[in-house]
């Protein structure tokens, strides 16, 4: 600002204000034009300091002069302004701009010796030789040279796009910045725009269309002579197939130049215009002024939309003259029509100031009221005759402002002076000081007649004073919270801009200087470098100070105020510095009781009086889809609670937090009340559990509480509490209905009163998230305005810390309180903490330290599970600052499934641990605050019993401490636990301080690296240092990584029978020793551990042990130092004694074990594992060639697990992880289909998903018919049930759908180029093209080579599932599917049958067993886990009709024999085994066979009549019955049968 004020000083500034803007015009230059010119210079990379001298102006003119002929209006205005400033520096007297422009150009011509010529419009503009402007193509030595675009130009383009977001300003901005550019430069500009890819795509499409049109209009000519430059194609103009040199040659060749740069610019402009229309869809015909919208705001919207309209200037001019007036509101339209034909925009803005706004309405209302009922201020006014109404604008009588047709006069309606409107007229305000009539003539402008004849500027009462006061009061009442903006007096043109800037800065919160009114706004000002304390007074018209001397150049004035008149000296054009701004204004000096800056200086400073109106927008909340609100009944309440709830609800209703629910609201949630902590007041609670279930989900924005150790050290701390935090934030109006609740009445004396919440309710799941989000939005401006202040907010607690002085800190706190209070939040004084100690988050804060609030451990005689949980919680809370706290044995007291009220039995270890914790808590500990400049360190110590403690500190000051006692594994060691502790501390430090501390670990580096080399995958470990703090973490035994030469090798195995719990553990050695131990009540894992212990116990100091149990291998490899398992502890003791132990794992080697087969092999002395000798060659093979797993298993015959272990052990082949891929349907009938293109041909590709088999061929066109024919051909060759494609028009055509329907194919569609939808065929397209490229030279046509490539891919590509080719795999899958279906059909015939059988000479029937297979001579039966083969002659097959039931239900019945006969019940084993010795077999009765329908649970009584009158039942019933005729049947059966069928089952021996 200082540079701009120093451009013109003294007489030069006065001379500037005499120069007219146009010849014969009224307007003259002002200082604001210099400010504008200084701002514009920055766009051209020119310093504004050049305006301060004649030589600097000459440099500016040399740069701008070549650009003027093709420049924008802004550039021409800047050139004209610099010409005027140059003339003033050169002391050339000029009257207007044109005269100054001629003088400056004449000087430039004389200086350069020749005038610049206009460039030819048919080719791109370029600067003349020797001149270097902002042109990418310049002429040097007769040749055109390309100069890359400057970073300033590119930065200006990117900034333009980012700020305007493809608004209407982007197109002219691009025109200006791309002037003279080549296509290469334009592409460089487009590539700089990174985030607006949608708009860039639109531009690319326009470029492609225009390039195609260019190619069609400019066909390629015949062959060109050697050396002749070709004509540009569309892609050449776009810069994709041409070089920069070619582009320059086309642009500047002597004959037939082609301005490729300008052509490409036009294409880009078309694309930008399309983007502008897309991003600004409002049509200019829709831009209409609102009924209360200021005219200036309407004009801004109109011209913004006008810029986006891509029409010629004539149409835009018509729109400006016609639409601007036509779409104005009625009030402004009436004023604009009175201005006559074609008024200027400045005249329209001036005439419509204040029209239609609340201020004008209030003024008209006040005038009407005054004329209708207001008494005259003159005592004798009633005796005088009232004159007719005279309108001041035209001077005619008989009408008011609304009916006047004359053009409005410019200037103030009150005093007639230009430069301000009546709303800001100094004579209209009741100022504190007024200028007296000394030496001043009365204004000659027309005014309302003064009955008293007194001068209107005198201090006595004037006729309009009452009217003005009432109008001002009405305006104040109407405008309410609208801010009063004090405007300049320099022509009136800065006022609209000031108003607009004020409105635009409204969302910046506290970024601008503000003065709250809790005290008088007094600032220090420097008047001509003399410091003065002044009061900022918006009620005073003028400024007056005392005690300074400003010289003799003054005018005497008399001003009147509350205390009377005082004599003053008025000084004009005085330099004043206040609030880091410099202005020049008029000031008076005199004997005033207080120094005052009035509106004349406040306006120059750009200050305004604002009343912020706070409003928190509610966040929209909905229920989950398909859910409805709660409809629960209110449960009964006591009279005391009902009265308490009634009082609470009435208070909340008065405060606007509740409102009465309408009778149409169907929802309800139960409410109740509980006593607060003080037991005197009640708290209302709503049971929102049901509403929470159906409310949409929320995310907690603040995931944890802030820790005091993370606070930076500050001198001042204050803590605010937001009272009724939730109740200060509105609930969305559409959601309020679901919060309805009812207050019942005692004995139902009256209907219950129903309420709904208008604010966030307590207990509702959305309240915390919405409150956290809202508070963040509220406090964000404050944080930005006060970056040196730490503001920590957690729910309703706010901590403010700073290094400011006490007074400045209190100001910030008060400012925050006012901000919160203005938004409707309360900050209760009783909860405001100003002095330490501060109670915050369970801690006590001091300026230099923090500590926990006093902890009190509970004292109880009987402890329950809940009491222990609370005790452990208190101790864990204390562990953040009290080092040494342990809870391991306390937690063991409540291990297992226990109820909260169950009594706990204390152990001696737990009691000792509690007493130790009490001693630790008795010594008060303190923590310190974080200092960012110091290093953060963490020291870890190991306590007893695998418990760890750590402290995080800076130098010797401890920030916080902690403990760790979590053991994730039963068998572990100290190094693994140490890694877990470090990981916990690292995460904690990242959360609290955002950085990783430097660790001091109690472990030797050699010990750590020995373990870490093999177990680096365990976790992440940051930088650390060794610290000698006993007890050190050590590894207790020496595991080596390579086999020990010469040491005995033990091969171990163990097994166990799950039913009998008996097992065996045994080993063999390479030296012929073996040992087997029988175990009882064991498990497989215990047997494996036992044999490992046996091998250690029976071996020498060095040993190689081979195991087949990953369980054992995992325990031993972890090098545990302690375990809860007895055998593992014995293993640890044995391994400590060894010098070296090598342990290796091989999968499930046979020959050793505890089962029957392995025990037999051990007894025979077969000790070899057959594939062990091939492991070493396989490892060598992999080390040489890094073979894959499949190759190792195929070549060396080793198991897949061994091969995978070899590959995973290789550092080069080790994979840290794999990407997570999507899954596709791989059923046997699923195919995927897609199109691909190669050498201009269309190839249709179909892939069998499960096998990778491919079908492809070249088709003439990409249409639905061709696709349908190919699909029909494919379906005739292979079974296809499902076809998956993209959703292209050819695949969704009717032809393809018809073929799919006819063949019976299910279609599904995905998204094009989405790898998770049709990724198989997309990948196959790529492989097909690669295969074609390998064999392309073997055929001429693309049709042939495609079929050849398909053959290679189907029959020569082995691998994958089954190690087959895709063709073999597909045929195998189809064959397998057929076999499976056949076997399933066969097996389904046996699943409902059971088999009873005999074995050997045993005559007892056994079973039943499950029938697996029935052959010609035998059947296969499954009994339990055994599978038996039984001859047909010793087996009885019966049908199973269901499981065994009670006797009165359906028992198991016999099924039909194979030859159609029914099996006799006496042959059923369960019956036959109960037959008495020597009993005869049953025989059918003579009178016929009786059948019993036991499956249905009843015995039929109806029989079919026959000629013999026999009791034969229905034929259908016989299929479900069993023949009952035997000598001995259960008594229950006998009773039933004897009663219903007396002739059934009679036997001579019965």
Swiss-Prot record:
Site (Cleavage): 135-136, 365-366, 382-383, 431-432, 445-446, 512-513, 611-612, 1050-1051, 1170-1171
Binding site for Zn(2+): 1182, 1186, 1210, 1213
Residue ranges occupied by any RNase H type-1 domain in the UniProt entry: 1044-1167
DNA-binding interval(s): 1393-1440
Record GO cellular component, one term: host multivesicular body
Cofactor note: Binds 2 magnesium ions for reverse transcriptase polymerase activity. Binds 2 magnesium ions for ribonuclease H (RNase H) activity. Substrate-binding is a precondition for magnesium binding.
Single GO BP term: symbiont-mediated suppression of host gene expression
Site (Cis/trans isomerization of proline peptide bond): 222-223
UniProt KW Cell wall biogenesis/degradation keyword: no
PANTHER family assigned to the protein according to its UniProt record, in alphabetical order: ENDOGENOUS RETROVIRUS GROUP K MEMBER POL PROTEIN, RNA-DIRECTED DNA POLYMERASE-RELATED
Further comment found in the protein's record: This isolate is from a German AIDS patient (with predominantly neurological complications) who was probably infected in Mali. The reverse transcriptase is an error-prone enzyme that lacks a proof-reading function. High mutations rate is a direct consequence of this characteristic. RT also displays frequent template switching leading to high recombination rate. Recombination mostly occurs between homologous regions of the two copackaged RNA genomes. If these two RNA molecules derive from different viral strains, reverse transcription will give rise to highly recombinated proviral DNAs.
Protein name: Gag-Pol polyprotein
UniProt source species: Human immunodeficiency virus type 2 subtype A (isolate BEN)
Lineage of the species this protein comes from: Viruses, Riboviria, Pararnavirae, Artverviricota, Revtraviricetes
Gene name per UniProt: gag-pol
């Amino acid at each position: 600002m200082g540079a701009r004020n120093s451009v013109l000083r003294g007489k030069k500034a006065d001379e500037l204000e005499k120069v007219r803007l146009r010849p014969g015009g009224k307007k003259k230059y002002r200082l604001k034009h210099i400010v504008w010119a200084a701002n514009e210079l920055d766009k051209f990379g020119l310093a504004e300091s050049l305006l301060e001298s004649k030589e600097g102006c000459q440099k500016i003119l040399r740069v701008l002069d070549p650009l003027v002929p093709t420049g924008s209006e802004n550039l021409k205005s800047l050139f004209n302004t610099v010409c005027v400033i140059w003339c003033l520096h050169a002391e050339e007297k000029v009257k207007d701009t044109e005269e100054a422009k001629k003088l400056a150009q004449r000087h430039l011509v004389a200086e350069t010796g020749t005038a610049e010529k206009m460039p030819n419009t048919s080719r791109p503009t370029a600067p003349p030789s020797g001149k270097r402007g902002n042109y990418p193509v310049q002429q040097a030595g007769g040749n055109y040279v390309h100069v890359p675009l400057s970073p300033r130009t590119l930065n200006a383009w990117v900034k333009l796009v980012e700020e305007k977001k493809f608004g209407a300003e982007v197109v002219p901005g691009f025109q200006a910045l791309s002037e003279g550019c080549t296509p290469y430069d334009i592409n460089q500009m487009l590539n700089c725009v990174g985030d607006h890819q949608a708009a860039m795509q639109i531009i690319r499409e326009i470029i492609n269309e225009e390039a195609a049109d260019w190619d069609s209009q400019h066909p390629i000519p015949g062959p060109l002579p050697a050396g002749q430059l070709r004509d540009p194609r569309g892609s050449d103009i776009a810069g994709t197939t041409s070089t920069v040199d070619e582009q320059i040659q086309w642009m500047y060749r002597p004959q037939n130049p082609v301005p490729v740069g300008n052509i490409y610019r036009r294409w880009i402009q078309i694309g930008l215009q399309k983007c502008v229309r897309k991003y600004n869809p409002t049509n200019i015909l829709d831009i209409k002024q609102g009924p209360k919208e200021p005219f200036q705001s309407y004009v801004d919207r109109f011209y913004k939309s006008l810029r986006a309209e891509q029409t010629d200037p004539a149409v835009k001019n018509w729109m400006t003259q016609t639409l601007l007036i036509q779409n104005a509101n009625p009030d402004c339209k009436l004023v604009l029509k009175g201005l006559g034909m074609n008024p200027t925009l400045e005249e329209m803005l001036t005439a419509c100031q204040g029209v239609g706004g609340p201020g004008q309405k209030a003024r008209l209302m006040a005038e009407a009221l005054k004329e209708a009922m207001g008494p005259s201020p003159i005592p004798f006014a009633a005796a005088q005759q009232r004159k007719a109404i005279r309108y001041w604008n035209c001077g005619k009588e008989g009408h008011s402002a609304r009916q006047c047709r004359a053009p409005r006069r410019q200037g103030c309606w009150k005093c007639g002076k230009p430069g301000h409107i009546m709303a800001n007229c100094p004579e209209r305000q009741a100022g504190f000081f007024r200028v007296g009539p000394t030496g001043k003539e009365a204004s000659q402008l027309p005014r309302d007649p003064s009955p008293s004849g007194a001068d209107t500027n005198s201090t006595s009462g004037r006729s309009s004073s009452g009217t003005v006061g009432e109008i001002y009061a009405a305006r104040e009442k109407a405008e309410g919270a609208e801010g009063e903006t004090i405007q300049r007096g320099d022509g009136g043109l800065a006022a609209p801009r000031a108003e607009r800037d004020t409105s635009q800065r409204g969302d910046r919160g506290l970024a601008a200087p503000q003065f709250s009114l809790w005290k008088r706004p007094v600032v220090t000002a420097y008047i001509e470098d003399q410091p003065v304390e002044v009061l900022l007074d918006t009620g005073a018209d003028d400024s007056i100070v005392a005690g300074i001397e400003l010289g003799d150049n003054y005018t005497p004035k008399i001003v009147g105020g509350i205390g009377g008149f005082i004599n003053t000296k008025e000084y004009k054009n005085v330099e004043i510095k206040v609030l880091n701004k410099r202005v020049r204004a008029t000031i008076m000096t005199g004997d005033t009781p207080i120094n005052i800056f009035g509106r004349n200086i406040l306006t120059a400073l750009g200050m305004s009086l604002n009343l912020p109106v706070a409003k928190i927008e509610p966040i929209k909340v909905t229920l989950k889809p398909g859910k409805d609100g709660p409809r629960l009944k209110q449960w009964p309440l006591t009279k005391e609670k009902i009265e308490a709830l009634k009082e609470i609800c009435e208070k909340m209703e008065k405060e606007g937090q509740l409102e009465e629910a309408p009778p149409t609201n169907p929802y309800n949630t139960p409410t109740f009340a509980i006593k607060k902590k003080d037991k005197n007041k009640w708290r209302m609670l709503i049971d929102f559990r049901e509403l929470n279930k159906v409310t949409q989900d929320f995310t907690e924005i603040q995931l944890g509480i802030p820790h005091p150790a993370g606070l930076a050290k500050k001198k001042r701390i204050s803590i605010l509490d937001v009272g009724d935090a939730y109740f200060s934030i509105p609930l969305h109006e559409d959601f309020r209905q679901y919060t309805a609740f009812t207050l019942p009445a005692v004995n139902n004396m009256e209907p219950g009163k129903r309420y709904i919440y208008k604010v966030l309710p307590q207990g509702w799941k959305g309240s915390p998230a919405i409150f956290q989000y809202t508070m963040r939005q509220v406090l964000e401006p404050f944080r930005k305005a006060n970056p040196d202040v730490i503001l920590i907010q957690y729910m309703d607690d706010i901590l403010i810390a700073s290094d400011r002085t006490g007074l400045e800190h209190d100001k910030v706190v008060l400012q925050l309180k006012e901000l919160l209070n203005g938004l409707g939040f309360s900050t209760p004084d009783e909860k405001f903490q100003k002095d330490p100690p501060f109670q915050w988050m369970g801690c006590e804060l001091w300026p230099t330290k923090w500590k926990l609030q006093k902890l009190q451990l509970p004292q109880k005689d009987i402890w329950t599970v809940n009491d222990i949980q609370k005790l452990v919680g208190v101790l864990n809370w204390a562990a953040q600052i009290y080092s040494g706290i342990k809870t391991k044995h306390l937690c063991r007291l409540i291990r297992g499934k226990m109820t909260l009220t169950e009594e706990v039995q204390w152990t001696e270890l737990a009691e000792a641990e509690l007493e130790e914790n009490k001693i630790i808590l008795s010594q008060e500990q303190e923590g310190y605050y974080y200092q960012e400049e110091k290093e953060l360190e963490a020291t870890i110590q190991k306590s007893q019993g695998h418990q760890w403690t750590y402290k995080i500190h800076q130098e010797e000051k401890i920030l916080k401490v902690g403990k760790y006692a979590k053991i994730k594994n039963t068998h572990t060691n100290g190094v693994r636990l140490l890694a877990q502790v470090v990981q916990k501390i690292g995460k904690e430090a990242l959360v609290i301080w955002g950085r990783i501390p430097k660790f001091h670990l109690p472990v030797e580096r050699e010990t750590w690296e020995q373990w870490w080399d093999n177990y680096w995958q365990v976790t992440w470990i940051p930088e650390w240092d060794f610290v000698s703090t006993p007890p050190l973490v050590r590894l207790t035994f020496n595991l080596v990584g390579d086999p020990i030469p010469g040491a005995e090798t033990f091969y171990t195995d163990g097994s166990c029978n799950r039913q009998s719990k008996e097992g065996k553990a045994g080993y063999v050695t390479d030296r012929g020793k073996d040992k087997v131990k029988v175990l009882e009540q064991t498990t497989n894992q215990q047997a494996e551990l036992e044999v490992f212990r046996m091998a250690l116990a029976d071996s020498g100091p060095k040993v190689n042990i081979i195991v087949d149990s990953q369980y054992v291998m995992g325990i031993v490899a972890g090098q545990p130092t302690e375990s809860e398992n007895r055998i593992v502890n014995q293993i640890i003791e044995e391994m400590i004694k060894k010098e070296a132990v090598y342990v290796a794992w091989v999968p499930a080697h046979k020959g050793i074990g505890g089962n029957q087969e392995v025990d037999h092999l051990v007894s025979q002395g077969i000790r070899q594992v057959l594939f062990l000798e091939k492991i070493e060659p396989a490892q060598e093979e992999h080390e040489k060639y890094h073979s894959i797993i499949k190759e190792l298993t195929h070549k060396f015959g080793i198991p897949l697990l061994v091969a995978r272990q070899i590959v995973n052990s290789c550092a080069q082949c080790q994979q840290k992880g794999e990407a997570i891929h999507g899954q596709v349907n791989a059923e046997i009938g699923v195919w995927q289909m897609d199109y691909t293109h190669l050498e201009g041909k269309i190839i249709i590709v179909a892939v069998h998903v499960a096998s990778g088999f491919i079908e492809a061929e070249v088709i003439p066109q990409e249409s639905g018919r061709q696709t349908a024919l190919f699909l029909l051909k494919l379906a005739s060759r292979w079974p296809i049930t499902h076809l998956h494609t993209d959703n292209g028009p050819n695949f969704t055509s009717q032809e393809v759908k018809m073929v799919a329907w006819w063949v019976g194919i299910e279609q599904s569609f995905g998204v094009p180029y989405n790898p998770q939808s049709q990724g198989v065929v997309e990948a196959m397209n790529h492989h097909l093209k690669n295969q074609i490229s390998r064999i392309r030279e073997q055929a001429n046509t693309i049709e042939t080579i495609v079929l050849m490539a398909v053959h290679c891919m189907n029959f020569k590509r082995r691998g994958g599932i089954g190690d087959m080719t895709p063709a073999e795999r597909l045929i195998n899958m189809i064959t397998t599917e057929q076999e499976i279906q056949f076997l399933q059909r066969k097996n389904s015939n046996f699943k409902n049958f059971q088999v009873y059988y005999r074995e050997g000479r045993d005559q007892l029937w056994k079973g039943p067993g499950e029938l697996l297979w029935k052959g010609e001579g035998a059947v296969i039966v499954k009994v339990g886990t055994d599978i038996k083969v039984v001859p047909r002659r010793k087996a009885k097959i019966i049908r199973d009709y269901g499981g065994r039931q009670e006797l009165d239900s359906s028992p198991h019945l016999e099924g039909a024999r194979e030859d159609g006969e029914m099996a006799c019940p006496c042959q059923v084993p369960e019956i036959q085994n109960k037959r008495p010795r020597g009993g005869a077999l049953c025989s059918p009765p003579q009178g016929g066979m009786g059948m019993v329908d036991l499956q249905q649970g009843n015995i039929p009584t109806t029989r079919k009549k026959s000629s013999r009158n026999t009791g034969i039942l229905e034929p259908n019933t016989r299929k479900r019955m069993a023949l009952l005729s035997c000598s001995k049947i259960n008594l229950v059966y006998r009773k039933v049968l004897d009663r219903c069928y007396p002739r059934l089952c009679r036997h001579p021996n019965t």
